[in-house]
Amino acid sequence: MVRQLILISSLLAAVAVRAPADPAHPMVTEAPDVNLVEKRATTCTFSGSEGASKASKSKTSCSTIYLSDVAVPSGTTLDLSDLNDGTHVIFQGETTFGYEEWEGPLVRVSGTDITVEGESDAVLNGDGSRWWDGEGGNGGKTKPKFFYAHDLTSSTIKSIYIENSPVQVFSIDGSTDLTMTDITVDNTDGDTDDLAANTDGFDIGESTYITITGAEIYNQDDCVAINSGENIYFSASVCSGGHGLSIGSVGGRDDNTVKNVTFYDVNVLKSQQAIRIKTIYGDTGSVSEVTYHEIAFSDATDYGIVIEQNYDDTSKTPTTGVPITDFVLENIVGTCEDDDCTEVYIACGDGSCSDWTWTGVSVTGGSVSDDCLNVPSGISCDL
């Protein structure tokens, strides 16, 4: 601001030199509008109960936005959509959210070349226990989704710590070339009495070139669920307490293609299953070029590895509308909690699962299924 005031003063001086005032008619010069100058500031800090509304209104006037101990009012989104190219958003302290039954999101970010990060002490606290009722998104209280990373291009989200989300956490949709690093979601409080549900870590749809590394997800649903998209990479992460690493469910959406996905170097702990591909009975789409590599898991409760082409109605014969091809498992080692866990279960439609390659796959401690259907050549449910 000081530099801008100096510039204004210099311009006024130049005008005075070029056009000397008539002593009989002295020139009157208006003072600069201080409020206007403030709006041009490149670094903006917003805090407290008015921080969210002020940030949403002033976001395009700032190249760097600090959100310091912001208290977002109930039923309100911390709206950082349509940011100017290159905007840098930094969370400081504790961001909190008022209570209301609504769908959310609590936070929304979109734009090009955007960086969103949290300082070392920053936490986005959803205080989800106010909504948790064991129903998740399937009934009971209407619960707000947490963080929409929609329509982001060539952007980065890093060092974000989210605590106790009411329901799903990150929704990644319509984004391209997005990198997410060192994301922590801690919903362990929701394990009490199984009150938290549908607290997916990352739901990905209609997005390309998404890279997620260094995540730690403690939740009660999919750690990652890729419903559609291409060129997606998830690595060097820990998933605990949820439903593991999932493709799908695929089908029933505008975009039902999943292609070129890699999960690498992930530990899956105490989850329903470690590896899952689920496609919708009777729908169409495709799943291809999916690789799980160097995955370690322990104490799976329901399945070690499960592939279902009748996900929404397992009583029906799997259908062929969403073929699963070029599916690679390499160096997968894990354990089931007990015999109630099925080590491997495959339910494919007739001829709709092909070109699978599994090497170095070991699942122990559970039961072996004798109900697998249309298992591809070279693959077995009895490892």
UniProtKB/Swiss-Prot annotation:
The keyword Repeat applies. It catalyses: (1,4-alpha-D-galacturonosyl)n+m + H2O = (1,4-alpha-D-galacturonosyl)n + (1,4-alpha-D-galacturonosyl)m. The active site is at D221, H243. It is an enzyme of class 3 (hydrolase). Keywords: Cell wall biogenesis/degradation, Cleavage on pair of basic residues, Disulfide bond, Glycoprotein, Glycosidase, Hydrolase, Repeat, Secreted, Signal, Zymogen. One of its GO terms (biological process) is cell wall organization. GO terms for cellular component: extracellular region. Disulfide bonds join C44-C62, C223-C239, C348-C353, C372-C381. Glycans are attached at N260. Residues 17-40 form a propeptide. It comes from the Eukaryota. PANTHER family: POLYGALACTURONASE. Belongs to the glycosyl hydrolase 28 family. Involved in maceration and soft-rotting of plant tissue. Hydrolyzes the 1,4-alpha glycosidic bonds of de-esterified pectate in the smooth region of the plant cell wall. This is Probable endopolygalacturonase C.
